[in-house]
């Protein structure tokens, strides 16, 4: 192994999906997986196979389609979890089972209700069983940040002897400071030596996930677990883009360490994840926030015009975030459109290009100026293959007195056009009520987000909804894209309905 290489373990599809409102369907996960492959991550944790049939299917489909990187599934230290993980990743060329058990006193006593000796025995059994499915087993000490270092060494030595190749030390609740993480990792690196790779997985509850990860690297960790845009439950995980660009930018601190990440794919990956999950990075987010390369201060602008390096330590083009210039128009041909897609990082087959080109031409008839971000949103939206059980045909709305609104909707279903109308508390509510009536399936709206894809009065509206439909305990996410915000809302709600029905019918 090259001891200067930092292995990038991306868990956007597993831990990142645990962000409230970030659940994804199988097709969406596949699109992100394909982009992560282009980004050049070393290991992709595709999900938690035992969590649900949907998770198992997504991991299995990704394992069939991704060839150049290692595919992992998480599994508790239980035979049924490990068996599910092994079966889900079986089509992959390079496979890993990532099994874990809690090691902190509070978790062992209150959650597991097990003694330390029992935990070690369970961990060893789990690793040995995982080895019957794959050669590459990773073991995680859940809540390592609050675990006793003597016990950590004892359990890690035992699982390494059982066959674990990677030892992961998560700061599960984001409690530790960089110096504390450094000391823990350094102690473990010195103890384990070259018997296994030491990995870290830091949460961001105190805003220290990236700082703790960088401290871990300096202490000798050679695998970092992270997510795109820092997605994750609670305050999120360490952001992949921040870790990678820090190592690259501060070579004075980290050389000769390096990653194999293709940094020019960072922006495209960030935008795809934001588009699919509906969770936009905050504007001032490092590296990928929309203000990351914006300068409003007159002094800063003057310096930038004279020499960009006066106020920018990273170039926008380094992460593939070139200026959002006008690109194509209504007279642009298919060949020019295909070239633009390649430049934006999309790898589509001929049928997908044709479908996207038709939608692009429709957009050109509605929108005067087309920007890169319009095309990114349009194509990302079109390549997510959700069966179109229902489709919006027409929509008209009007505002009434006392805050009420009405909506009339026509929907295509099984070659039939069904029309209806309803009143609601606001236009969106009226639209959703009509769709419920036409489909005969009522939904409860849990979240509704509006984003302008690009600049201008005629900017595309990207709507993301989160809906719980009757008979389901889980929320379904839908996306809609249109110049008209209410039409985008209708499309998003129908997208969620179609996604719910397609999953229900599997």
UniProtKB/Swiss-Prot annotation:
Record-linked InterPro entries: 2-IPM_HCS-like, 2-isopropylmalate_synth_dimer, AIPM/Hcit_synth_CS, Aldolase_TIM, LeuA/HCS_post-cat, LeuA_allosteric_dom_sf, LeuA_bact_synth, PYR_CT
GO molecular function: 2-isopropylmalate synthase activity; acetyl-CoA C-acetyltransferase activity; manganese ion binding
Coiled coil: none
Keywords: Amino-acid biosynthesis, Branched-chain amino acid biosynthesis, Cytoplasm, Leucine biosynthesis, Manganese, Metal-binding, Transferase
GO aspect biological process, one term: L-leucine biosynthetic process
EC number, as in UniProt: 2.3.3.13
Pathway involvement of the protein, from the record: Amino-acid biosynthesis; L-leucine biosynthesis; L-leucine from 3-methyl-2-oxobutanoate: step 1/4
Domain of life: Bacteria
Region (Regulatory domain): 391-506
Disulfide bonds: none
Subcellular location: Cytoplasm
Cross-referenced SUPFAM superfamilies: 2-isopropylmalate synthase LeuA, allosteric (dimerisation) domain (SSF110921), Aldolase (SSF51569)
UniProt xrefs under Gene3D superfamilies: 1.10.238.260, 3.30.160.270, Aldolase class I (3.20.20.70)
Cofactor: Mn(2+)
UniProt KW Manganese keyword: yes
Annotated ranges, domain Pyruvate carboxyltransferase: 6-267
EC class of the enzyme, as a word: transferase
Residues involved in Mn(2+) binding: 15, 201, 203, 237
Subunit and interaction comment: Homodimer.
Protein family: Belongs to the alpha-IPM synthase/homocitrate synthase family. LeuA type 1 subfamily.
Function recorded in the entry: Catalyzes the condensation of the acetyl group of acetyl-CoA with 3-methyl-2-oxobutanoate (2-ketoisovalerate) to form 3-carboxy-3-hydroxy-4-methylpentanoate (2-isopropylmalate).
Name of the protein in its database record: 2-isopropylmalate synthase
Protein's organism: Campylobacter fetus subsp. fetus (strain 82-40)
